[in-house]
Amino acid sequence: MLKVITKEIPINEELKTRIQFICDFCNTTPTFINGSIRKVEKTNINYIEPNKIIIKGTTFLAFNHGRDVYVENLQKHINISDLQEFIKNL
C-alpha cells in the first residue's frame, strides 16, 4: 500500500509582506493558507501544493520565491507587480 507523507511549507515572509502591502493599498484583507509537499514514500514522486491567498473571494496560488501568482488554477498567471491592478478590478 502506498503511503503519502505531507509536510506543510510556511509561506515566505517576503511574499506575505508584499501581498499584504498590495492589499493595504486596495483596502482589502488577504487570507493566507500554507502550501505543502506531498511525497509518496519509497518513490521519487513529489507534489508541491502552492500557498493559497484568498482576496475578495478569489483564490490566488503562489509558490515561495516566485514572481507570479496564479488566479484560481495554474493556467492563468499574473506578475506580482500587476496584482494591485487586478484586485482593483475584482
Question: Which residue stretches match the model-derived regions?
Answer:
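Residue-level detector of alpha-helical secondary structure
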Residues: 6, 12, 16-23, 27, ...
